[in-house]
């Protein structure tokens, strides 16, 4: 399911009475949610940090503290790595486990997530500000599908025999890398947790994972489910903490064999440097984006407007895939802007627990201030502010859906990743022009093109310098397809069969035999 597909019949959306009736059938948040898990998870045990320090976890819809969580630092990372290395040692329960049993454990974990789906969605809303229904239908559905997808792969990873010259028998093995350090962001806490651990565990690795300090609660809850599912101690270790301490310790740890990170390009560079300075651990990076969304005049205009709207504003604009550079062909530019503004003005901003809410708060005050500063830069540099542009006068970190027109390529809002509910609409005249401009970016995560001409669509898709290109759709992500960036949007791929390659080593084994026969 994509960001624009919280399925509800059209007649229900159009009829207020039918809408209210349908809301009675929708899933509900867990009332009076109890936060049970606030400690570090090592060796299937809940532990206090060695330092005894804790840090606050807040609700971005109110700005109020929800709880305190134990703060891991280097000493705790050392303990977790030791546990993970022991779990990965030759002869351990995990190393001797049948691949099919690893798959069964992942499937069991998916069952437990399905059982606790409403609780986990409530946690994502409380801690991350996501509208509950979006968390339930999009994030949690993605989590369950990812776990089941990799559960099915576990006993299907295999090598091959190779017909080499001479009297030799040669075959390959796909072996787990070892201990994998993983650092995940705050915009999709539970989904990114699953994107990281599922392929790693499928291949037989062990994991030390650090959730973002803003949103550790759902990852910690998953620790309880991982233990309940039956994963052996030390296979998954979850350590909440800060990037400069816990994150840096993971990136530079000599006992970690591979690191995977999702976050900013700036931090990604630091992680790659630390990996190189330590033990040349393997690195997968999924970093920032400033993605082009190209709308040709022959596209279905209403559909393109809605897809472009969802492509920017989904998840409060806090998406690395956000289609924030919308290039619109000149002949339909004014009409596209008009309809986009009308749609943005209809967007409902409110409590994440209100079922009619489309947009919740930004994650924290720092991000809120950054977005407003970039909006002001757009005004100062001459873009036309069509609507929005301000924070909403209420508790929490809410920002109005904002649309800019008359944006040029040299403006900060057209070059920098805003990570907020800000839509920039640029105009173009020719295909060659828009291809060149769309590719004129340090980033290359995703791109999209809307047109009814398949030849035009395929020509643009092949020209885009991006890891994913969507044609007549946006944010159509799934567990089966590889995802990753070109240029400064990262390296390596997550998801799909390609994601398994990032968590395994290929070993060649050659045996001398008396005589080879074909």
Swiss-Prot record:
Molecular-function annotations in GO: 3-chloroallyl aldehyde dehydrogenase activity; aldehyde dehydrogenase (NAD+) activity; retinal binding; retinal dehydrogenase activity
Q: Which residues carry this modification: Phosphoserine?
A: 351
Protein localization: Cytoplasm
Q: Which residues bind NAD(+)?
A: 184-186, 210-213, 264-266, 366-370, 417
Q: Which chain positions carry the site (Transition state stabilizer)?
A: 187
Q: Which residues are annotated with the PTM Phosphotyrosine? A: 168
What SUPFAM superfamilies is this protein classified in?
ALDH-like
The UniProt entry's coiled-coil ranges are none
GO CC terms, sorted: cytoplasm; perinuclear region of cytoplasm
Write down the top EC class of this protein: oxidoreductase
Describe its partners and assembly state. Answer: Homotetramer.
Protein name as it appears in the record: Retinal dehydrogenase 2
